[in-house]
Amino acid sequence: MRIHSPAIRYFDAVRKAGSIREAARRLNVASSAVNRQILKLEAELGTPLFERLPGGLKLSSAGEVLTRHVAIVLRDAERTRSELDALKGVKTGRVELTAVEGLSADFLPSVIGRMLEGHSRVRIKVVTAGSTTIPALVVNGDVDLGLAFSLPRNPELHQLAVGRFRLGAVVTPNHPLAGRKHVRLGDCADFPLIMSDSQLSIRALMHPIIVHSGRPITPAVEANSIELMKNLAEHNLGIAFMSRIGLEKELSQETLVHIPLEDRGPVFTELGLYMRANASLPVAVDAFVQVATAEIHRRAKDEG
C-alpha cells in the first residue's frame, strides 16, 4: 500500500544513492522511471533538486530543503501503516535508529533480542554514528530514534528515557592503578592516556576534568572509536576513559578493570533515548522505545 506519491519515495532513494541508476537498482525499477519522477517533481516545484555532476548527483539548496520534508512524510506514512496493521492485529513494522558505537557490544543486542522475542516480524535498522552526528539524523527524520551519551539540550529533540552511568578509567588488571576504588585524572597523568576526540561526547565531559587536574594532559592516542580505545587499553597501551557500557564482556572475563573517576565528586555520563520533538511514533517504534527504556533503567539501577 502506497500512501504517498512515488516521486517522494524516488527522490529519497536518489538522495541516499547519489545517482539515478543506483537508486533504480535499489528500488528494483527502471532508471527511466526514476528519472521521470525526479524531473516531474522538479517541474512541479519549479527548481532543480539536484546538481548534475560528473561524479553523480548532489542535492541543490532546494533539494536540501525538501529532504527534511520528505523524511517526515515517509516517517508519517510508516506510522500510519503501522497503526492500520495494529488494528488488524498484525505485529509488523520497521524501526530505524542511530546509536553510538559503544552500545553495539552488549546493550543493543540485548534490546534487539527482547524486541524480536515479542515482535518477530518487525524489521530493525541500526546506523552507528558519533554523538555529534546523531541529533541531526533524528531531527531530519533520517531515523526514528537516537541513542547517545550526554547530548546537549536541543529543542528539536525529545528525550524519552535517560540513565546515569559512572565515567571511569579503564585499565588491565595488572595495571598499577587497578586496585583503586576510584581515581582522579591527576593519578592517571603519569601513564599513557587514550582519549576520545571531539566526535565523542566523552571529550566534552573530560574537558573540565582536564582543567581541574592542574597538570598538563597530553594523550598518547586520540581516537573516535570506543572499540579502538577499549582494545588499546586491553593491550596495556594506556588508560582509556569511558562508562561500563560497552565493556560488559571484558569486565565479566576480567581482561579489563573499570575504576570510577572522581573530580570534585563522581563523574557521570547520561545515556539518553531521543526522538524528534512533536513527532508521532509508529506502533513498532513505540514498542522498541518501551524495551530500550526498560533496559536503560535496569542498567542504571545496577550501576547503583
Language model: regions and residue ranges:
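Hydrophobic hinge/microswitch elements
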Residues: 130-135, 139-143, 148-149, 199-259
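A late-sequence structural motif
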Residues: 107, 257-301
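Beta-alpha-beta core module
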Residues: 155-161, 165, 180, 227-277
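Secondary-structure junction motif
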Residues: 178, 192-213, 281-290, 295-303
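Central regulatory/effector-binding core of bacterial HTH transcription factors
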Residues: 92-155, 222-223
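Short helix-boundary/capping micro-motifs
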Residues: 12-30
